[in-house]
Amino acid sequence: MTAPLKAVEGSVDLPALMLQLGRQARSAARVLAIAPTAQKNLALAAMERAIRVNAAAILAANAEDVAEVKASGASSAFIDRLTLTPARIAAMADGIKVIHDIADPVGAVTERWQRPNGMTIERVRVPLGVIGVIFESRPNVTADAGVLGLKSGNAVMLRGGSDSFRSCRAIHDCLVQGLREADLPEAAITLVPVRDRAAVGLMLSGLNGNVDVIVPRGGKSLVARVEAEARVPVFAHLEGVNHVYVDRGADLAMAKAIVLNAKMRRPGVCGAAETLLVDRAAAEADLAPLLSVLIESGCEVRGDAEMQRVDTRVKPVAEEDWSTEYGEPIIAAKVVDGLDGALLHIARYGSHHTEAIVTQDEAAAARFLNEVDAAIVLHNASTQFADGGEFGFGAEIGIATGKFHARGPVGAEQLTSFKYRVHGTGQTRP
C-alpha cells in the first residue's frame, strides 16, 4: 500500500499534493468499506494504546502550540479549546475504547420485508466513502473524527487549524501506528501536512470527486465559508446559541445548578449556554439567586434595565447579544412572558443546536421538547450534555444542526448511508 505524504515544510505544489492525498484516501476507503469488524477493532485497540503510551509526546507538542497562541493574544476560551491535559488525553483514549466496543454499523440490516411476488428487500448500512473534516483549534477532533471514520468504514481527510498543527500531528502519529498494526492503509486517516489555508478551498472542491462529504468544526466564519464554497454535501455544525429557560415550575436549587453548569463548566464548548431566560412568574423569587450564582462564579451577565434593577452588577445588553455565541464566561439574560415568551425568543435567536428547560411541570416540559426546533432539547439537564460521548457514541465528529441525513451528535452510525439488497428467485416484472 502507498503511504500518504508526511508533514511538508517549505514550498509545495499544493493542488498536486491535495489531489494525491484525495486519491489515496479514495483507495483506502475501498479497503475500509469491506474491512471486517475484527480488523478495524484491532486498529482501534492499537490506537488507544498508542495514545496512552505517547501522552507525554502529545502534551509536549500541545505545549508548543499553546505557547505560540498565548503569545498572539488569543482569548481564554480559544486557549482552553486548544489545550490538552493528561485528563483530556485519557478521555481521548477512553473514547477510542468506547468506539471499539460499540456495534459496527457497516452491514447492519435496518429493515427487511418481503414483497407479494416473493422478493425479499433489505435496507443495509454502508459507509459514505471519504469524509473531509475541517476544524479549528480542537486537536482532539483528530482522534474523534479519525476513529469514528474507521469504525464506520470511511476514510477521513483531516485539515486541522494551523494553531493546533503540532498537536494534531502528534495524535495522528498514534492513529497511523494503529492502522499499521492492523495492516490497514495509512491513508485511511490522512492529516493534511501543510498549514496553508488554500488546502481548505481545495478540499471544498471535492478533489476531483475524491471527497464525498465535508464536516466543518469551527466558528461561524469557517462554517459560512464551507457552506458557501463546498461542491460536496456538508454536515453543518453551526454555532451554539443555546438557551436555558427557567420555568415557573422549576425547583430553584436545581435551576441554579443547571444554569451554572450549562454556562461555566466549560464556557468555550459548543454546548455552553449563552442565554438565560426566566419566566416572569418565577422572576420575583428566582431571578436574583440565579444572577448571583452566575456573577459570583466569575460570569459576566448582560441584561436590560429590569435585570439591572434586580442586580446592579448586571451589564447592559445589546441586540446582538441575543444571537452571540460568546465562548467566554458571559451570558445574556432576559425575563420572558412564560413558556410562550421563551419559545418565541428561541425561535428568533436560537441556532437550532441545544435548548433546555428547567421545570417540574411535565406538561410545560413536553410542550417545550415538542415545539423547540433544535437538534438537542433537554428537560432538567445541562446543555453541556450536548456531546457524542455523553450520548454513548464514544465520540462525535460534530453536532449537526441541519435537518438532512444527520442531526445532533454525529457518531459512527450517522457516518453511514444505506443501500437496498434485493433477493429474488427468478422473478421478472410483468
Curated annotation (Swiss-Prot):
<dbReference type="InterPro" id="IPR016163">
    <property type="entry name" value="Ald_DH_C"/>
</dbReference>
<dbReference type="GO" id="GO:0005737">
    <property type="term" value="C:cytoplasm"/>
</dbReference>
<keyword id="KW-0521">NADP</keyword>
<keyword id="KW-0641">Proline biosynthesis</keyword>
<dbReference type="InterPro" id="IPR012134">
    <property type="entry name" value="Glu-5-SA_DH"/>
</dbReference>
<comment type="pathway">
    <text>Amino-acid biosynthesis; L-proline biosynthesis; L-glutamate 5-semialdehyde from L-glutamate: step 2/2.</text>
</comment>
<dbReference type="InterPro" id="IPR016162">
    <property type="entry name" value="Ald_DH_N"/>
</dbReference>
<dbReference type="GO" id="GO:0050661">
    <property type="term" value="F:NADP binding"/>
</dbReference>
<comment type="similarity">
    <text>Belongs to the gamma-glutamyl phosphate reductase family.</text>
</comment>
<dbReference type="InterPro" id="IPR000965">
    <property type="entry name" value="GPR_dom"/>
</dbReference>
<keyword id="KW-0028">Amino-acid biosynthesis</keyword>
<keyword id="KW-0560">Oxidoreductase</keyword>
<dbReference type="GO" id="GO:0055129">
    <property type="term" value="P:L-proline biosynthetic process"/>
</dbReference>
<keyword id="KW-0963">Cytoplasm</keyword>
<dbReference type="GO" id="GO:0004350">
    <property type="term" value="F:glutamate-5-semialdehyde dehydrogenase activity"/>
</dbReference>
<dbReference type="InterPro" id="IPR016161">
    <property type="entry name" value="Ald_DH/histidinol_DH"/>
</dbReference>
<dbReference type="InterPro" id="IPR015590">
    <property type="entry name" value="Aldehyde_DH_dom"/>
</dbReference>
<protein>
    <recommendedName>
        <fullName>Gamma-glutamyl phosphate reductase</fullName>
        <ecNumber>1.2.1.41</ecNumber>
    </recommendedName>
</protein>
<comment type="function">
    <text>Catalyzes the NADPH-dependent reduction of L-glutamate 5-phosphate into L-glutamate 5-semialdehyde and phosphate. The product spontaneously undergoes cyclization to form 1-pyrroline-5-carboxylate.</text>
</comment>
<dbReference type="Pfam" id="PF00171">
    <property type="entry name" value="Aldedh"/>
</dbReference>
<dbReference type="InterPro" id="IPR020593">
    <property type="entry name" value="G-glutamylP_reductase_CS"/>
</dbReference>
